[in-house]
C-alpha cells in the first residue's frame, strides 16, 4: 500500500479545498459502485483510493463532471393525467 500525501495530490489540484471536494466526489463514486477504480484497490477504503488516483493524476474535475451528467428522467404518469387537475 503506497502512502498518499497531501503534497502529492496538490501537484494535480490547485488548493486543499478543491482536493477535498474532488476526493469526496470520487470516493462516493467508488463506494456506491458507480465507477471502477483506476488504481489497484489493495484493500484500501474508497477515500484512500480516490486520493491515490488524484496523486497519480488519473482523476480530475473533467472526469468527475462527466460521471455526474445524468439523463433526464421521464415524469411520473400522474403528472400527465388530466384528471389530476389543481382544485
Swiss-Prot record:
Question: Which reaction(s) are listed as its catalytic activity?
Answer: RNA(n) + a ribonucleoside 5'-triphosphate = RNA(n+1) + diphosphate
Q: List the disulfide bonds.
A: none
Q: Is the Aminoacyl-tRNA synthetase keyword given for this protein?
A: no
Instruction: Please tell me whether the keyword Nucleotidyltransferase is annotated for this protein.
Output: yes
Q: A GO term (biological process) for this protein?
A: DNA-templated transcription
Keyword terms, alphabetized? DNA-directed RNA polymerase, Nucleotidyltransferase, Transcription, Transferase
Task: State whether it acts alone or in a complex, and with which partners, per the record.
Answer: The RNAP catalytic core consists of 2 alpha, 1 beta, 1 beta' and 1 omega subunit. When a sigma factor is associated with the core the holoenzyme is formed, which can initiate transcription.
Q: What does this protein do?
A: Promotes RNA polymerase assembly. Latches the N- and C-terminal regions of the beta' subunit thereby facilitating its interaction with the beta and alpha subunits.
Family from the record: Belongs to the RNA polymerase subunit omega family.
What name has this protein been given in UniProt? DNA-directed RNA polymerase subunit omega
What does the record give as the organism's lineage? Bacteria, Pseudomonadati, Pseudomonadota, Gammaproteobacteria, Pseudomonadales
